[in-house]
A protein has these predicted regions:
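C-terminal-of-GTPase-core extension/linker across diverse P-loop GTPases
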Residues: 1-153, 158-164
Length: 164
C-alpha cells in the first residue's frame, strides 16, 4: 500500500516526521509513505527543470522530488521496473514486471517483436548518457548482445533485433 500524504506548505519542514508517523501507524510489509505538498509540486511541474531546482533550494526542499519518490515506491510495491529504447531523435521508457526476459520486454513494445525476437543489444542508461549515442557505445564495445534468456534490468537501454 502506498500512502501519499498531502501536507500544507507550513508542514514542509516536518515532512520526514510526518512520514515516520504514518509509517509507524500503518507499518507492515508492502507499505510505503511519501509526504508531499501537492500545491508546490503542481507549481514545480510547470517550471523548467533548472528553475524548479532553484525554487526547491530556495524553499529548503530536497533536490529529489517527493513525487518522483512516490513513483519509485509505487513501482517497487508493484514489482515493476523500466527499460528504455533510444533512437536518433527519441528515448522512451517502457514498464515491465521485474524479472521479465528480453522477449517479454520486447512484447511490451509490440507483440511482433516478441514473436520474432532474435537478440537484444543492451547498455546501461548512465553509459549511454556518458557516450552520447548508441553508435558511440557500440564503437567503444559497451553494447552487449543478449539472447532470449536475458533478464532485463531496471534502466537498461535495449535495442531489439527481430525477424518475422
Amino acid at each position: 500500500m502506498l500512502l501519499v500524504v498531502n501536507i500544507g506548505e507550513s508542514q514542509l519542514a516536518d515532512a520526514e516526521a510526518i512520514e515516520r508517523e504514518f509509517a509507524s501507524k500503518h507499518a507492515g510489509p508492502g507499505v510505503a509513505v511519501v509526504a508531499l505538498c501537492a500545491k508546490i509540486e503542481a507549481e514545480l511541474a510547470t517550471m523548467e527543470p533548472a528553475d524548479a531546482l532553484e525554487f526547491r533550494r530556495d524553499l529548503g526542499l530536497p533536490e529529489a522530488s517527493p513525487l518522483d519518490r512516490a513513483i519509485r515506491e509505487a513501482y517497487a510495491l508493484l514489482d515493476l521496473q523500466s527499460f528504455l529504447t533510444a533512437g536518433d531523435d527519441e528515448c522512451r521508457a517502457w514498464t515491465v514486471r521485474r524479472g521479465s526476459s528480453a522477449p517479454e520486454a520486447a512484447g511490451k513494445i509490440h507483440s511482433d517483436l516478441e514473436k520474432g525476437f532474435i537478440r537484444a543489444e543492451v547498455a546501461r542508461w548512465d553509459e549511454l548518457v556518458e557516450a552520447g549515442s548508441l553508435a558511440e557505445l557500440k564503437k567503444r564495445g559497451r553494447l552487449h548482445v543478449e539472447g532470449k534468456t536475458y533478464i532485463v534490468q531496471d534502466g537498461d537501454v535495449v535495442n531489439i533485433l527481430f525477424n518475422l
